[in-house]
Design a protein with these regions (language model features):
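Alpha-helix initiation and N-capping motif
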Residues: 42, 86, 111-112, 207, ...
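Short, charged/polar low-complexity linear motifs in solvent-exposed/disordered segments
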Residues: 181-183, 287, 312, 419-420, ...
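C-terminal segment of classical bacterial N-terminal signal peptides
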Residues: 1-5
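Hard-cation-handling environments
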Residues: 292, 296-391, 419-424
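Acidic, metal/ion-coordinating pockets
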Residues: 6-306, 346-358, 368
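Feature captures C-terminal
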Residues: 13-16, 26, 34-36, 40-44, ...
């Protein structure tokens, strides 16, 4: 006797997710500071993305992880010189058809007027689950608690697959930026924030996949009793529910699996900065009778340094590029002698003298603090242009005048020098605190600590006592 039995209906769905992070204005294959072509950038990344769109169709998800509003003169020009036009970063995001965007610390730093407008102009969801209206800090998971025009998460449907993306920003903003820049906002600690939003999403959305999109490094950075600057690893370990965490902020490449407290492995991937790479995840989902029974996830870092230029995109933005070149080539002064930022790391330098003198002249302060923000930049003798100033300060800085005691000044300088200068115990020791492992780190350039903390002072008369 033969009987017919129904075989379970099996369906396989293949998806690809591509992440960019810490773009810092690297939209076009041209360095507006050095005035020369460069590799990578979004114009090259878009060529790769278009190839993947041709392969995956609507099953491709494109996400960006913030820090897009500072870094190259083109974004400064858009933020402050041409503020009435649509923000250039928003225009580029919209042109490339991103599906989701997060906010980075360098997107907060330009100030309310810039980032509020940028958020409104971006057409895809801009995410910030831990960026809340100040009256709701550490409250329940509620979409109306999130800062104006931001969303805690986005929802995407790809071939029947429901995906939720939770966005978060490093909560260390108060360590760097004056409250006036983020008035009305609070930044929640990442682990507790992730826990409440994962539960909210699981209860209310019931997705097939949950991704994190975190502008926060893997680990390390600033740690206080209230928060961790680089909290991605902590979230991956302590908050079950994530399938993949796409992250950034630390300007380092990561592609690793972290085991959470339930024993499940979570892919954590970071493409680093300046669109030299993209991070991607290939996902294969297997369904039987409508039920998800298997997830296969693979992470990969893809270099786009030598990818072909998307000529159509370049042509589209060429009129804007020409206007920016006119701006950065504008003459603003003249140097009789060249200045080198490298000298600032080893002693007196014309660069630090320039900044110290300007700060004391403008502020009328008695003492100036200044740290070099570029390791090996040169401004040649001769005409100085607007673009040259970005060589000294890639990310625009604000000047603050503080009232300090002599003891506070001493402690501040000791704190700086302790990170900068090594205590030699043998002739073989380095005079400076060096670290070979950080040679490729954009913010440490071979030093043990971040060079933006290497403050020197001007205006102090020193005396020696023996």
């Amino acid at each position: 006797m033969l009987t017919a039995t129904a075989q379970p209906a099996t369906k396989t769905v293949r998806l690809k997710v591509i992440e960019t992070s810490d773009v810092h204005g690297h939209f076009f294959p041209y360095d507006f500071m050095e005035k020369k072509p460069i590799k990578g950038t979004l114009v090259r990344a878009n060529s790769y993305i278009n190839k993947q769109r041709a392969k995956y169709g609507d099953n491709l998800l494109l996400i960006d992880n913030g820090d897009i509003l500072q870094g190259q003169p083109c974004v400064y020009w858009s933020n402050y010189v041409m503020p009435e036009d649509e923000n250039l970063a928003a225009t580029v995001i919209n042109y490339m058809k991103y599906d989701a965007e997060t906010v980075g610390n360098h997107d907060i730093e330009p100030g309310h007027k810039v980032y509020d407008k940028w958020i409104r102009e971006v057409r895809c969801p801009v995410l910030g689950a831990n960026i809340v209206k100040e009256e709701y800090k550490n409250g329940e998971a509620a979409p109306d608690h999130i800062y104006t025009n931001l969303k805690p998460y986005s929802v995407h449907y790809k071939d029947g697959v429901k995906i939720c993306v939770i966005g978060m920003l490093t909560p260390a903003i108060p360590n760097w930026l004056n409250k006036s820049i983020w008035k009305g906002i609070e930044f929640e600690e990442m682990v507790s924030c992730a826990k409440k939003w994962v539960k909210y999403i699981q209860d209310n959305e019931k997705p097939d996949l949950i991704f994190g999109l975190f502008h926060s490094g893997l680990n390390g950075g600033i740690k206080t009793d209230e928060y961790e600057e680089d909290g991605t690893e902590s979230v991956a370990r302590e908050v079950p529910g994530f399938d993949i965490i796409f992250f950034g902020h630390d300007h380092q490449v990561h592609n690793e699996w972290i085991t959470n407290k339930e024993g499940k492995k979570v892919l954590c991937i970071d493409p680093s900065c300046y669109v030299k790479n993209v991070a991607e995840a290939e996902i294969e989902l297997t369904y039987k009778n409508g039920h998800l029974v298997k997830k296969d996830i693979k992470g990969k870092i893809v270099s786009v340094l030598d990818e072909e230029i998307d000529q159509q995109m370049l042509n589209h933005f060429q009129p804007t590029i020409d206007k920016i070149k006119t701006y950065v080539n504008r003459r603003i002064g003249r140097f009789e002698h060249p200045i080198y930022t490298r000298e600032s790391f080893f002693g007196n330098s014309a660069f630090t003298d320039l900044v110290h003198n300007l700060q004391m002249r403008i502020s009328k302060a008695e003492i100036s603090f200044n740290a070099p923000l570029a390791f090996n930049t040169i401004i040649k003798a001769g005409d100085v242009t607007q673009g040259d100033m970005f060589k000294l300060y890639r990310f625009e800085n604000l000047m603050f005048v503080l009232r300090m005691t002599g003891e506070e000044v001493r402690k501040h300088l000791e704190f700086s020098y302790d990170m900068w200068v090594n205590t030699m115990t043998s002739p073989d020791d380095h005079a400076l605190r060096l670290n070979d492992a950080s040679k490729d780190d954009q913010q440490r350039t071979g030093f043990q600590y971040y060079t933006f903390n290497f403050d020197s002072a001007a205006g102090i008369d020193y005396s020696s006592f023996f």
